[in-house]
């Protein structure tokens, strides 16, 4: 960098260096150099002069005319060597500070001379000679002296020159502090040159500075004068001040040399090897401001070429200079560099070195570039940025530049749009038009125009229009061919102006527009008229109501606004009172009529409200409007169903099976399709509570409508949007209703191919379906997806059930409806609000209340099937209204249905959520119900909380029944309650008027049959009706409630009202639901076993009523007794259900075990009964667990589960507030529940256990509605418990939506039980027998759940009527390997299709399973081999495989919960262990996930290894295993810990057990595992590893495990619920399911089988994935869909290899499903499979996989 020429000899070099410098430097920056030189020389002169004035470090004293002058020998030597030689010749040179006289010179004259010497930038030779002459004249011997003087001067000069050469020698000798480069540096002035000579000569140096081992000899005086750093260091008391040699750190010798040259000579150049940036730092550190200026100058000169037009070689150096300036803080240089870069940003940004610029500087470049935008350069910068984007290669180092260019382009477009009128006139815009005209695509112009369209506002529209007009008139636009583009934008602007005329005319720019334009716009705007109203009228027309699909779509937006209208619409058939509740879409036509008739007030608005509600979920659900909407919806739904009965084309096959079925199915499908997409877990979460609360009202109507299954579809249509809100609940309800309906129509059920048969297998199956739908509703979005699959079967089942009989038909119809319209629950909710609004409707509803429980169940179901939440809700809503209609026609039937309401825990859970709302809402319209509810709530807040999900719906429904029914007779309600309780399913068939009577009769018959057959629905309804006396029957009732979605939902809602007023469903929707479920179960158990019931009830109450202590049990009982009066059956149902739950689960988990508890209690009081329950009650148990499963996922249960802290599940102290609040469970689901519950029987612990998903949550149940929604969106599992008598007891859905019904109960209880079991021995101390029974029940329940899910799926399968839920995974899990083999084999041959749970549903299932294990236990116990076989057969019918999988999933969940509860109850919980190990084969995935956890627990449970216990253990182990992942791993302790499910035990135990339970386990487990895996997958895609581990290595083997793992890996885990983590298999399955369901949603509507198959396939996938421990790279949706499709096809082709004798059947069924992984590559999105082999029904509906993410 030395620009001085190469200096020759040092002596010559120095003098010539200035010339050399001038010669080398005169460049383009000469002016800057001159300025810098002047500054530096002046500074040097000033510094040296300061030495003289301050007399720093002087070493010589001159006496002049009596005056003393202190000077520096070195300076005098450098500046005036002759004078120095003259005065020192007379003295000894060695002395310092010697007084030297100067004669013949005046002091003033000498002083002036010294100043010149020290400061002059010019040579002082003349002054020196002058002073010497004066001195010599005064000398005595002037000549001689003169000669000597000159001699001395010459000598001195020579010496100086000679000394100057010495440094050369020294330099050559190794002192490298002086180099030739340094010698070449040019001094700034003569003073600098003289001082530099002094430095180089090293004369009179008095200090050595060591840097990098090199010594620099210097003079203290000059260093101090030039540097503040040295001045401070060399003066004062510093050690360096007295040292001869000092060492400097942090500086290199090159930098030191540059610094010394500048100090002495003020050099303006640096050596080439110097680091300018580092020198800048040195200058700052040593206080050399001049050196800093020189460094900046060098940077500008050498790096930036003084910022003249950059050339390629300078671009990189300018960037380097920019970085240096930024690091050192040279703002001026930084600004100069930045300005240069801004001017040529495209060149600089494309430099590779730009990638090395710090990101903050890059951002500054971008921001400054954006700031530089102006009217003139905006278009230019837009083009430049586009060139940059198109020209840069797509490599790593260009990422930053590309990103910046894209941002800049966007800013340019924004700027141009904002200033379009000015930019348009600029030359750069003309260039832009030219370049775009020459471009193949005028993309930049298109971007500008699109941005203009997007940014049109009232303020800028006028100015934009004027600018476009100007542009259109310009020649350039016409020449370049952009007239069309510009005109298109102008037309849009014109349209906007016309539409927004009233807003635009007030803007300033409007005044600037041309008058002609103003007049034209005004004329066009004023001629609008009432077009919009006209547009709405068709939507409100009755004719449009029949357009279910289109209406759903149309009304959806309105539905949000007109939820009430939507809800009322489904009830059209009953009356137009529900009209106000505008149908979502299916019931829109009927709803319109009804709305127009009954609630003319804003039909459209109501419809909009419903739609909004569906969309917003919680928004509209929590309100009286919803309550009103529900009854209306039911009525409209009924009417619409009837009107649509001929119209429904949703499932022609199923329609063929049963007109009603078709109606419900068609509507459900349409609604599903229309609304399922809209239904979201979040929406559901919020609305589910509302629905749950509103559901009681709706339930009441549902009861009324329970008679006609057709009502479900109508309700769906009417409540399309509501359906979305309550879709989870509704879908589940519908499904549950469908199941119950199937049961009710046990003889009729076969009318519907799959669903009917599924439901037919028994009320248990129906219950399972119902509970499961609840779980599904809870699933939320995933549930929706899964329920799309499930919905088909559900709807079919519903239709079949309708055909089957009033009782079963209704229930089936409800499931179908729920399945089809994810908004069944919403419909119910809508109907309920409407009921509130329209007391007459309530009266009708009261008549229909028997059906209303079904509706609630349906709601629960829809909540359960969040995947089909919208559709299911729609279906349920429609069903509810239809039920209402039927109810109007058949008050008796409705009353009968009222019983089923309490009967269905799932429904109750779901309805409970809605019931909470409805209770609140209903309380306003009618105090009768409220009073009964009030008594219930206060008495058993905790129980209410537990039951809140399940029973709350019942209570509220009951309340609604009371309120709505008072006009009718309470006797009727009681009768309804009794009848429905006996056969909650009849409620669903009731929606049809004809079937209504039949249904009623059937319900009564079911009631009889229920007691006789022990059918879940009948038995449960009857048991509940019968009274607490049938404690185990009530347990089944609870299941029945869940199972009989519509009826049970309503009953469940009413049940809390009647059975558990203290339980206060309304208050603690989530917690209370769980608690209510528990207390109900406990009651059932108590009634079953007298001595068990009291404690159980207490536990239930305590669990359900954190605020209500154990004493509350009395209240609960009294409340139940009170309820008995008007709702004897309901009361029994609720009580029995609740006590059952509480009794068994008390120690386990009052709330979580609600379903399980029901089962457990049932099982405990009579193991025989539970054995039966295992077969018949397996569904129920599953249903109950499913209801619990739903709990975590359902809104309410979700709340409970999400905040599944111990208190959360059992119930919250705020139970009463829950009554009031739509989602008070959100408020109190946590601590209060846990505290009281745990006190009583560890119920509060149950609460924690219940929230395996929420193990980490605070006891105050901190899960937010969002979390609840997530859960709700998750898989909804219906747990069905079979009564000992064979009745299926829909325990609970494990969905939040079902929470009001008791859904949280099973989940909460079972899950809560586990944590509480850990925490409290009481739960664990529940009798082993009971626990074993419960375990069996739980396992059976799991199977039932799956069967139930399968039921939903197999609604289309006629053969799957009753067996389905019983058969489920539960059968496999709880029956002996051989026993289950034969049964499962038939089931396998039937190829039961589990409902394909959506991811959310799967998550919910996982969550529910985690919590529902306890419920599964009862199911296991009650499930007898025959029951299990029956369930299996039922599942075989069409849903068998899938249902089983689902059930088993639920069972696993329930089992998991139960196992947890059992951990406390070690005997029972661990009874599952042996079977669990067996079951792993069957439910290996579930077991593997849960079993790994659970296998650890099983040792405890194995204390009582009963065969059925084993079944239960197996099943529970599956469920538990799944749950164990998050819940049961450590038994109770883990139950309370969220990480539980993370502790997946390796499936070694599973592997050992697989062979025995393989057939059965695989069947049930795959069904269960699939949902659970799906659940886990949906919820915890992150846990894939766990999923792999959890997935059984043996069962569905590696393929399934792999699939599971793949799904699991693909799906991100939902941190929200530990259950997701817990149920790895479920997560995987859920993930698969989610993908499948999303893809399958549309097809699911039409194909329940497809849904079931999907679920089964997903399970297989999950299991295969887990077994393979391979993370498949299946795309979450498409690949899974393809995989599942292929697997389905493969299954259709051949039953696959059995894994063992026990696995043979299971494997036949499952191997059919296990090949999807193999054929996953096949990219068929839609697969048409018709195979009698695969399908027990011999019917494979088209498996349409609509891969939606």
Curated annotation (Swiss-Prot):
It is found in: Cell projection, Axon; Presynapse; Cytoplasmic vesicle, Clathrin-coated vesicle. CDD domains: BACK_BTBD8 (cd18490), BTB1_POZ_BTBD8 (cd18285), BTB2_POZ_BTBD8 (cd18286). SUPFAM superfamilies: POZ domain. Gene3D superfamilies: Potassium Channel Kv1.1, Chain A. Residues 732-749, 864-880, 999-1009, 1079-1094, 1119-1148, 1266-1281, 1294-1306, 1377-1387, 1453-1468, 1508-1519, 1531-1548, 1629-1644 have a biased composition (Basic and acidic residues). It comes from the Eukaryota. Residues 629-638, 707-731, 776-785, 842-863, 904-916, 928-949, 1024-1034, 1060-1076, 1327-1339, 1357-1366, 1549-1580 have a biased composition (Polar residues). SMART domains: BTB (SM00225). GO terms for biological process: clathrin-dependent synaptic vesicle endocytosis; neuron projection development; synaptic vesicle budding from endosome; synaptic vesicle endocytosis; synaptic vesicle recycling via endosome. Residues 11-20, 607-616, 1208-1217, 1418-1427 have a biased composition (Low complexity). Involved in clathrin-mediated endocytosis at the synapse. Plays a role in neuronal development and in synaptic vesicle recycling in mature neurons, a process required for normal synaptic transmission. This is BTB/POZ domain-containing protein 8. It comes from Rattus norvegicus (Rat).
